[in-house]
């Protein structure tokens, strides 16, 4: 394919922005990172240095980018949840193609504004529902399309977030409050609902959901617990100990985005200071969090097929686990291995996922790389069909989440058609 190299701007140089920038370096013949906008100096300067970005293309605010004439092909939006829709609309109006981290917006109106903006300005939009692009997803869909289990009847899908990851992001961290970010289902698991819909291959019609902030509450705080882990006499016995999460992981390695996000420039002194003064050193029972720590979502599709999704914050971290029940067999999978059981033959066939999906950059089982590459290939060939998570598809997925939240809060079953009529 004789196509040009695509130039991309990164908005938000945190964990997700850094991942996409690093993935771009694996495909230098297809793309390059030409600019970055990030308010935090350490993260901004690090990404700029690693990608040799010219000083004139290094910005502390994304608004500054738009003061210049268009100088890149696309933008990757990896800002905080409540900072996705505004830049998406603005960059669409300036003719940039857009790859945006989920969620597209935090309510139906925000999502619709983004979709209308990209359609009006004839730019491509891809939303990072990365699980659609994972290697095992392609294998699963191929098995199902070839009739491996007959007609899909029901799906069970579990996301064990992991107790320490949940505490980091949704109790102490940036996604702990709905008014500052979004509900946990939207922030963490929208691509799970999207993936279920993609696997079933049908439109969701009805949703119900249950969940709450059951455990990470002040009334569950042990009697002798301190406000901060560094002062707490129970720290060594607590599974949510901040020193164990951050300090020990820093000392033992390897360093990951969770440790790095605590203080930016890593040193033992900086981590201790962050735990003493910042949000990540707080007792998990003494935070200002309000998002649910567990949730189930029940889905009914137009065909009559059903699915249940479970988000477990208090859990051992592990791969997502799925069971797909069909009329002629069932599939069990965890992202690394697929088990196909035939009712007729009473036999299990095991399928290992191809090794090339387990590279150092195989986030979401290769889905992150696949999502970025499909977006760039769409731009290089002027072929939006290469994007499988475009505007209307993503809008439907977001409405599934919004319906689930209405159900959870109002204690009722919600029809998806209700969302199409909701306007502020």
Task: Describe the function of each predicted region.
Residues 1-53:
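N-terminal Rossmann-like dinucleotide-binding module
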